[in-house]
Amino acid sequence: MKVLFFNSPPFFLAHGGMQTLTEALMRELAGLGVEVEPERWWDENQKGDIIHYIGRPVALTVRAAHQKGFKVIMTENLGQTASRGWKRRFAQRALTDLARRALPGGFLDRLGWEVYQELDAMVYVVEHEWETAKYLFHASPERGHIIPHGLEPEALTELARPQKPEDYLVCMASIYPVKNNVLLARAAQLAGTPIVFLGKPYAEDDSYFLEFKQCVDGKVVRYAGFAAGEDKNRWLRGARGFVLLSQYESGCIAVYEAAAAGLPLLLTDLPWANKVYGQVPAAKFVGLGPPQRIAPALKRFYEQAHRQASATFPLLTWRQVAARYLEVYRKILGGA
């Protein structure tokens, strides 16, 4: 079995969870005996059995792949769409259905809506995103699969190690508006709640990053930059709790890492969080709003939060995740 991977946008333009997923899948699938390669757009002689798109391809591409004998699978992030209110999603479905009837087929192909009926398999990290795909785009119900992200076994072991607790909360996320880093920093200042931010911007001269740095005072709000390996693990193990006020997420790996460290969670009261972690006893939720509205909830969370001796919720290794993808590959190849 040979699988070709395609990721858009490319990693040099946007780092994040989908890069981590792609790299982990290619590595772990190879360990399970699957031949993997990146899709070589310049190589007209490249061969394979499956094309795995990380992100939505256009229908014309899927049809061309089928004509060449490939099966096609997509892993899609619908976090933003799935976090919209039901009224907006209802209106979007109505407009989408109207456009399907009114617009010519070639135009619809460019929008990518028809791809949900033509893919051999679709994978989502969380259930509510798959439900959104079926609701909005009439995705074929029998072709959907829910496979969460994972972590390295070494990371699970290292994050679970005991460490002397310190008095701070931690937020680990890229520094850009979707993550609401500035909002959280200002709320922490109002609450007098010490917090450490880990992460990097998409550009050092980005205006949002510059605004964020103005909130850093080195006392209540600290910024440790991008952290990896033991440096990241140390910050997580020493924290009282983990906070993330994103507008949307899709199986956020930072949340998984915080859970592996046994940290209680304070997350946005939006579907990406409350529908996924709503049954987790150590998870709390706060609605988005101005800093003065968030500050009291942040202060209460800080006062009550303490690291647990075990993971906040069950987690998989990347090898286990890859094994689930391999089951899907075999299914669409007819049990090969």
Q: Model-derived features: where do they sit?
A:
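Short, structured helix-loop element that forms part of the nucleotide-activated donor/catalytic region
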Residues: 19, 194-221, 231, 235
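Conserved donor-binding/catalytic core segment of Leloir-type glycosyltransferases
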Residues: 162-179, 185-192, 196-198
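Conserved acidic donor-binding segment of nucleotide-sugar-dependent glycosyltransferases
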Residues: 283-291, 299-303
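A charged, aromatic-enriched C-terminal amphipathic alpha-helix characteristic of glycosyltransferases
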Residues: 17, 303-334
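Acidic anion/phosphate-binding donor-loop and adjacent secondary structure
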Residues: 134-135, 142-166
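Aromatic "clamp/platform" in nucleotide-sugar-dependent glycosyltransferases that forms part
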Residues: 247-248
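Short hydrophobic beta-strand element within catalytic cores of glycosyltransferases
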Residues: 264-267, 274
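Membrane-proximal helix-turn-helix segments that form the acceptor-binding/catalytic region
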Residues: 97-122, 131
